[in-house]
Amino acid sequence: AIPTQSCILTHVTNTLQLIERGAPVDLVFQSVAGTEAANSGFGINLAMLQEAREAALSLRRGTLGNNVMYFETGQGSCLSANAHHGVDQQTCEARAYAVARHFEPLLVNTVVGFIGPEYLYDGKQIIRAGLEDHFMGKLSGVPMGCDCCYTNHMMADQNDIENLSLLLAGAG
């Protein structure tokens, strides 16, 4: 059998309800951001994430380690929520990794290019942001993934996304 972990991409409160009902939850998913105001906009706080982590650990489904959290992030989330307090989006993203690191995640996945041209205008900016996120993930010591994507109204195309994917593979 292949070792597999299941995860439902839903709000953390829904996952807590599933755990309370006895569902077999392996990983708890939640989008996180780098400011308290942005996380509040997501309907979460640190105590809620801690409660979810403890609930998932109580199920004792893992056979190795205590990594039961899966977080998604992305440059621009604090800006789009007007919750950046004048701080640049890369710094806000690095702060999101600090939030995630506290909960010993299995994966922190940046979804670079998802928000659109308001925050990352073109393919060059998507590539830059993806490499910044990868670098900050390494510096922060979080298990980092990168979902390279773009919205159709951006000045980007599939070649930009493939270039970023190759650069990330080379960066390790």
Question: What does each of the following model-derived ranges do?
Answer:
Residues 1-172:
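Anaerobic metallocofactor- and corrinoid-dependent redox/one-carbon enzyme cores
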